[in-house]
């Protein structure tokens, strides 16, 4: 199977897993060893500004976007105490991985310090935890019709409200989510 890195997974309505129901996941990695991604539409109920304050990081230069309530996301059920920042490419920080399409994933504290300063990435998401799949696990879930896939785009990542991302991702395929059957079958 071709790599789905830099794609979105859209949960099918039939996916009744309590964590993954109605999720959109950005796939950061996908290869023969497995896959890793971040859920981009499940806020934790913590504002990024509050997280920075809890970590004793500077907030005096926090952008207007943060002041208006940018949310920390529940990135997935794995390592929920570990932070990830998905952001537009800027080569300033340690522990950054270039993902393609002008995106980077950074796991170091210095990017959070930058978010509270004038060196913030242009656009970013902060998530705790990630979604992970072992070898062939994601491929099996795709064969089981648990997920739809579309190429990732910056607008869905950064410009659409969290609560609208699942619907908007479905619309990008040319239909509304309610039009999807909750059951898979054979013709």
From Swiss-Prot:
What GO terms fall under cellular component here? Answer: cytosol
| Superkingdom of source | Bacteria
Q: Which family does it belong to?
A: Belongs to the UPF0301 (AlgH) family.
Matches recorded under PANTHER family:
UNCHARACTERIZED PROTEIN YQGE, UPF0301 PROTEIN YQGE
- Full protein name: UPF0301 protein SO_3346
Question: Lineage of this protein's species?
Answer: Bacteria, Pseudomonadati, Pseudomonadota, Gammaproteobacteria, Alteromonadales
């Amino acid at each position: 199977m071709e790599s789905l890195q830099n794609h979105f997974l859209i949960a099918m309505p039939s996916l009744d897993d309590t964590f993954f129901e109605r999720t959109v996941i950005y796939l950061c990695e996908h290869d023969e060893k497995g896959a890793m991604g971040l859920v981009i539409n499940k806020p934790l109920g913590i504002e990024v500004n509050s997280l920075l304050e809890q970590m004793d990081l500077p907030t005096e230069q926090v952008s207007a976007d943060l002041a208006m309530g940018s949310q920390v996301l529940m990135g997935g059920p794995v390592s929920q105490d570990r932070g990830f920042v998905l952001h537009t490419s800027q080569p300033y920080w340690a522990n950054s991985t270039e993902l393609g399409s002008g995106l980077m994933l950074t796991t170091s504290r210095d990017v959070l310090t930058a978010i509270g300063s004038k060196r913030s990435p242009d656009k970013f998401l902060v998530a705790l935890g990630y979604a992970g799949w072992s070898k062939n696990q994601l491929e099996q879930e795709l064969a089981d019709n648990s997920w739809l896939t579309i190429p990732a785009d910056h607008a869905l990542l950064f410009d659409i409200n969290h609560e609208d991302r699942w619907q908007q991702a479905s619309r990008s395929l040319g239909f509304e989510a309610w039009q999807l059957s909750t059951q898979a079958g054979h013709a």
